[in-house]
From Swiss-Prot:
HAMAP family: PPV_L2. Interacts with major capsid protein L1. Interacts with E2; this interaction inhibits E2 transcriptional activity but not the DNA replication function E2. Interacts with host GADD45GIP1. Interacts with host HSPA8; this interaction is required for L2 nuclear translocation. Interacts with host importins KPNB2 and KPNB3. Forms a complex with importin alpha2-beta1 heterodimers via interaction with the importin alpha2 adapter. Interacts with host DYNLT1; this interaction is essential for virus intracellular transport during entry. Its main location: virion. Keywords: Capsid protein, Cytoplasmic inwards viral transport, Disulfide bond, DNA-binding, Host endosome, Host Golgi apparatus, Host nucleus, Host-virus interaction, Late protein, Microtubular inwards viral transport, Phosphoprotein, Viral penetration into host nucleus, Virion, Virus entry into host cell. Belongs to the papillomaviridae L2 protein family. Minor protein of the capsid that localizes along the inner surface of the virion, within the central cavities beneath the L1 pentamers. Plays a role in capsid stabilization through interaction with the major capsid protein L1. Once the virion enters the host cell, L2 escorts the genomic DNA into the nucleus by promoting escape from the endosomal compartments and traffic through the host Golgi network. The keyword tRNA processing does not apply. This is Minor capsid protein L2. GO terms for molecular function: DNA binding; structural molecule activity.
Length: 469
């Protein structure tokens, strides 16, 4: 039986090992010497190509792959720069402390008591010497040459760095007692001058731009954008749109009961369901209302957001709808009839006056023996009856000028040329008392805290008024 000879390949020696043995004998293979000496084709390309191209600092070559000094920087980024303004602490001059030589016979106890250093204050303040004012010395001379005086001015400035600081004492605490006196005579009024304030409006042009303080109250109003092209217009007839709009979107749901209709309403629809009103289908938000005026009407408007589709991320996509309901129409002014005022010398009468089929009536108390018959008509007619035959006549009576209802001329009342006497209203007067409060356990009566009541105005028209002469 023949055994097969082993064909194991023997590893060739490295180029460095071959170069050591074959260089002296001259038997080196042709690829060993250029590889060891760095004279291959690639080395020659780098050697001659580096003369035209400079790659300094990039670490390209046969060195380590560290990227040079600054390292590798990602493309498209800026390498970090070091801060240039680094605060440098000023050098502190340290005085050298001389060393004391300790001998073998010196004491082993070191004294820890330091000598007290005295810092002298600054230069003393020079006080100029003032000569005594006992009299003047007058020197006379016959020489007419003007005298030349040597005048020297001395100014002294105190430097707070070299002067002793002044001692500041805390203020004395104030004390008060619990007794005080309130009296009307101690109250005095001051006459202050009222200066009218003007608002300055700065006008500018397109060339010169001037900045000025904004005028208060001139904030621009934000447009609602109710009638834009991307907003759907829907007219609502149901009156529940103004009081409880949630009933038009969802059926009876306790979660939406008690919501304020004047705020923005949010709705959540988990599944597909029909709304009570088809116009409010898929509404997820109904914004707060707004009153607008358009084409002679007062309009109640609300903007709603629909959710017709939604993405996986939860974003809702839908239309923007403008729901509106016209409240009333703005008509022209109503023609009013003036009331005549005559003297009060007429007897007790009764007038039945009607405007637009009896909107208000004026009656007088019956305190005579005659029976009065009145009826509503379009003109002022008076019917008076007695035991004899009556004669119809038109009579105008004056209105009462009591204390509570003063009669004054206005846009709806026309007086005759007779003079009107102003009625003097009685004003109650009384003694003025002084309140003296002494002590710390008192309280004022609640009536002193009440403010002055504002006088209520009584309407003179479109109401039943009782007239007495």
């Amino acid at each position: 039986m023949r055994h097969k000879r082993s064909t194991k390949r023997v590893k060739r020696a490295s180029a460095t090992q071959l170069y050591r043995t074959c260089k002296a004998a001259g038997t080196c293979p042709p690829d060993v010497i250029p590889k060891v000496e760095g004279n291959t084709v690639a080395d020659q390309i780098l050697k001659y190509g580096s003369m035209a191209v400079f790659f300094g600092g990039l670490g390209i070559g046969s060195g380590s792959g560290t990227g040079g000094r600054s390292g590798y920087v990602p493309l498209g980024t800026t390498p970090p720069t070091a801060a240039t303004n680094i605060p440098i602490r000023p050098p502190v001059t340290v005085e050298s402390i001389p060393l004391d030589t300790i001998g073998p016979l010196d004491s082993s106890i070191v004294s820890l008591v330091e000598e007290t250093s005295f810092i002298e204050s600054g230069a003393p303040v020079v006080t100029p010497r003032v000569p005594p004012t006992t009299g003047f010395t007058i020197t006379t001379s016959t020489d007419t040459t003007p005298a030349i005086l040597d005048v020297t001015s001395i100014s002294t400035h105190d430097n707070p760095t070299f002067t002793d600081p002044s001692v500041l004492h805390p203020p004395t605490p104030a004390e008060t007692s619990g007794h005080f006196v309130l009296s009307s005579s101690s109250i005095s009024t001051h006459n202050y001058e009222e200066i009218p304030m003007d608002t300055f409006i700065v006008s500018t042009d397109s060339n010169n731009i001037t900045n000025s303080t904004p005028i208060p109250g001139s904030r621009p109003t934000t447009r609602l954008g109710l009638y834009s092209k991307g907003t759907q217009q829907v007219k609502v007839v149901d009156p529940a749109f103004m009081t409880s709009p949630a009933k038009l979107i969802t059926y009876d749901n306790p979660a939406y009961e008690g919501l304020n209709p004047d705020t923005t309403l949010q709705f959540e629809h988990e599944d597909i369901s029909l709304a009570p009103d088809p116009d409010f289908m898929d509404i997820i938000a109904l914004h707060r209302p707004a009153l607008t005026s358009r084409k002679g009407t007062i309009r109640y408007s609300r903007v709603g957001n629909k959710r017709t589709m939604h993405t996986r991320s939860g974003k809702a996509i839908g239309a923007r709808v403008h729901y509106y309901q016209d409240l009333s129409s703005i008509t022209e002014d109503i023609e009013l009839q003036p009331l005549q005022h005559v003297p009060s010398s007429l007897p007790h009468t009764t007038v039945s006056t009607s405007l637009n089929d009896g909107m208000f009536d004026i009656y007088a108390p019956i305190d005579t023996e005659e029976d009065i018959i009145f009826s509503a008509s379009s003109n002022n007619t008076l019917y008076t009856t007695s035991n004899t035959a009556y004669v119809p006549s038109n009579t105008t009576i004056p209105l009462s000028s009591g204390y509570d209802i003063p009669i004054t001329a206005g846009p709806d009342i026309v007086f005759n040329s007779n003079t009107i006497t102003n009625t003097v209203l009685p004003v109650p007067t009384g003694p003025i008392y002084s309140i003296i409060a002494d002590g710390g356990d008192f309280y004022l009566h609640p009536s002193y805290y009440l403010l002055k009541r504002r006088r209520k105005r009584i309407p003179y028209f479109f109401a039943d008024v009782s007239v007495a002469v």
